[in-house]
Amino acid sequence: MKIGVLYEQREDTEEYPGENQDIESGRRRKRPKLDREQIYDALEKLGYEPSYIQLDGRDASLFAVAKEDVDLIFNLVDSYGGDDAKDLHIPAFLELIGAKYTGSGPHGLLLAQDKSLAKKIIGFHGLQTPFSMVVHRGRVDYAHDIKFPMIVKPVSEDGSIGISNDSVVDSVKELMERIHDLHEQFEDVPVLIEEYIEGREIYAAILGNDPPEALPLIELDLSKLPADTPRIAGREVKFDRDSEAYRVTKSAVAEDLDEKTTEKLQEAAKTTYRALKLRDYGRIDMRLSKDGTIYVIEANPNPWLTKGAEFAMAARGSERTYTQMIKEIVEAAVAR
């Protein structure tokens, strides 16, 4: 089977951004070069015929995809023309030309991208999510009464873009300043204000479709952060190599959770995955509070797939090799 590894060409980074370096380039992020290279190598080991298909943000490169002689496209495009908000148009185009591809479709990407809408859907399915409201310039959409502390972030960004230690606010003055800063930085993108939940940062990798499987849970351990630092996975934790927050945090399989709590977290993740129409693979981010309450924070339909990323870490925890993980993603897409 011929498989085209589809990606957008931007400045490459040789390392996994979540672990090794700052990936922010203005507003947008760069997908790691190793992501596509490791997937390509895994596809070769599996006996497939992989090839690279490159987008460069110009329409000609997109239209050329229709002429590619491949049986499946392994879609690694999470932006178009450097704009993350346009990632859903790539699978929409692939469907228009009748191409098979891995990962979530445009519907799932849209639902996951709009955090406010996703929270409403998650709540409808009986899951807990932090109380929130959305602020536009000159207008506030109230959902609930929220108490301080709050966390303030763009409503439609991912990869911790727009989130830093300053995102957690404790007063009206700090709240208004943060809203203003985000509206300036993100060109009037609506701002999501959420109740800040103190607790453990849990990631659930989901693999497959009918039924989806929740892999072993991963925890980003924030317990060693300085006392005056909010326990969030912001820029300092993920990308700022010179910060203490970066040095003292790490992800690992959450081995100390009891069986009942683990099952509840995995079920919440699978419910979220299905409710938001995700498919083939994805990651659900949650908070586990001190009293055992599970809060679904957001869904990531296209998490990084490098060997050092949390998704591959979870796959290893289930005794899968990296190559087996890629094989199952391919098989899930082909079976649809």
Predicted regions, residues:
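ATP-binding N-terminal substructure of ATP-dependent carboxylate-amine bond-forming enzymes
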Residues: M1-K100, H107, L111-A112, R137-Y142
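Active-site nucleotide/adenylate-binding loops and adjacent lid/helix of ATP-dependent enzymes
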Residues: M1-Y7, V65-D69, L110-L192, E198-R200, ...
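Short acidic/His/Gly/Ser-rich catalytic and metal-binding motifs that mark active-site loops
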Residues: D12-P17, D158-I161, D242-A245, G308
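Alpha-helix N-cap recognition
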Residues: G57, D170-S171, T321
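ATP-dependent carboxylate activation and anion-phosphoryl transfer catalytic cores
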Residues: I121-G123, D256-R336
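Phosphate-binding site of ATP-dependent enzymes
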Residues: V172-A252, D256-E267, K290-Y295
